[in-house]
Amino acid sequence: MKHSYFISDLHLSETQPELTALFVDFMQNLAPQAERLYILGDLFDFWIGDDEQSALIQQVKDLIKFVSDQGVQCYFQHGNRDFLIGERFSKETGAQLLPDYQLITLYDKKILLCHGDTLCIDDEAYQQFRRRVHQKWLQRLFLCLPLKVRVIIAEKIRAKSNQDKQAKSQEIMDVNQAFTAEKVQEFGVNLLIHGHTHREAIHQQEEFTRIVLGDWRKNYASILKMDESGEFGFIKD
């Protein structure tokens, strides 16, 4: 039966090879069988520009290109850790870049896709930070810096982010329910798929269904499968 996959929040890095191994297994065995593959952000733990080169980055790009070459339509939506992924990455992998909110039609279902961080409006400090770093002039300035400097800046931002999370309540870091409902209504859908919060779940709400993709962990890959009958669910080992 025809089907498609949705994943997010892998946070791939050289320090967690077990996550890379899970991704390799998925991309070599499951992904090539799909019609579409949607990666909804935070594929990498951080991204400092398309000009960065490493064995891990090349391996990931090669895997996406391999799946794309099998005829699978691959899509990438920016996360809060890898929002600087650009056109060079897209060309090298065959993955189409999507905007912050993307409306798709899949198996006769209208679906709204987003990474999920834009729905967490109660975290005002993060939203202010997000608005700053998404300014195009600031991104251009950052990308002009030497790679070594960008790495230092990215590591400091990541450390600060991890520190801040310890002081924030779980409620603040989750989606705002009212705002999320407004977005769903704005796009005229009854199905929303997002990641970011790392709280894998399928929320059957009164007027719409909200599917939250989970983060990938040492022994678990959060993979949502949707088939042509319209059925969906997370793949369980």
UniProtKB/Swiss-Prot annotation:
Q: Which GO terms describe its cellular component?
A: cytoplasm; extrinsic component of plasma membrane
Note the effect listed for residue 11 to A: 17000-fold decrease in catalytic activity
UniProt xrefs under InterPro entries: Calcineurin-like_PHP_ApaH, LpxH-like, Metallo-depent_PP-like, UDP-diacylglucosamine_Hdrlase
Required co-factor?
A: Mn(2+)
Q: Which residues bind Mn(2+) 1?
A: 9, 11, 42, 198
What family is this protein classified in? Answer: Belongs to the LpxH family.
From the Swiss-Prot or TrEMBL record, give the protein name: UDP-2,3-diacylglucosamine hydrolase
Name the species this protein comes from: Haemophilus influenzae (strain ATCC 51907 / DSM 11121 / KW20 / Rd)
Identify the coding gene. lpxH
